[in-house]
């Protein structure tokens, strides 16, 4: 990633705090659908399985995982929707 996380301007935020598999990824799928092409989504999650599931989601569907960060028991992801 070329720019610092703090400088990223997100188009939407998905707060999946307190939710467990498969809910965060199901919500992510719907939220990404609502984004414009190349839109940036920030995901906040507390389920450790998102460390595996969200990167795989991005690879499988062609979205870019711009950044990911763990802060204690909170996991943050910045996902750029693929351009159509």
Curated annotation (Swiss-Prot):
Keywords: Cytoplasm. It is found in: Cytoplasm. Pfam families: TusA. Its main location: cytoplasm. The keyword Cytoplasm applies. GO terms for molecular function: sulfur carrier activity. GO terms for cellular component: cytoplasm. Sulfur carrier protein which probably makes part of a sulfur-relay system. This is Sulfur carrier protein TusA. It comes from Pseudomonas syringae pv. tomato (strain ATCC BAA-871 / DC3000). The gene is tusA.
